[in-house]
């Protein structure tokens, strides 16, 4: 049998956060088929950057990061719709998530 952790993703992907809607914490999952410099940002619906969760060169694999609904200063953000975006090499993808209070 093959261990799933040995199987690498075939394509870059940003997956839907879980849980969604969420309060107070959600997990953002993403797939890296190759080593890449990864940046993950949180934006509000006006396009303002709220936080940066990842800024690192990462090895290929199935990865995840948690967001605790705080901004870059550690302050809780208000309920609403937020965007999360991955930039990994040339790959960019954005998804929506909902924070309930």
List PLM regions with ranges.
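Surface-exposed, proline-anchored Ser/Thr-rich loop/turn motifs
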Residues: 3-31, 43-48, 79, 98-101
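Short, surface-exposed loop/turn motifs with a glycine/proline- and acidic-biased composition
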Residues: 54-89
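Beta-strand signatures of extracellular beta-sandwich domains
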Residues: 39-43, 52
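Surface-exposed loop/edge segments in extracytoplasmic proteins
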Residues: 48-54
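Extracellular and select intracellular beta-sandwich modules with Ser/Thr-enriched
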Residues: 91-95
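Conserved beta-strand and immediately adjacent loop positions that scaffold enzyme active sites
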Residues: 39, 66, 96
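Short proline/glycine-enriched turn/loop motifs at strand-loop junctions of beta-rich domains
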Residues: 33-37
């Amino acid at each position: 049998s093959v261990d799933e952790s040995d199987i690498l993703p075939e394509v870059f992907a940003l997956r839907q956060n879980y849980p969604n809607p969420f309060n107070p914490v959600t997990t953002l999952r993403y797939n890296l088929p190759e080593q890449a410099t990864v940046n993950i940002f949180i934006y509000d619906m006006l396009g303002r950057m709220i936080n940066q969760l990842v800024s690192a060169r990462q090895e290929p694999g199935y990865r995840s990061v948690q967001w605790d609904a705080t901004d870059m200063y550690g302050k809780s953000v208000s309920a609403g719709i937020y965007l999360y975006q991955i930039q990994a090499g040339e790959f960019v993808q954005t998804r929506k998530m909902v924070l309930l209070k």
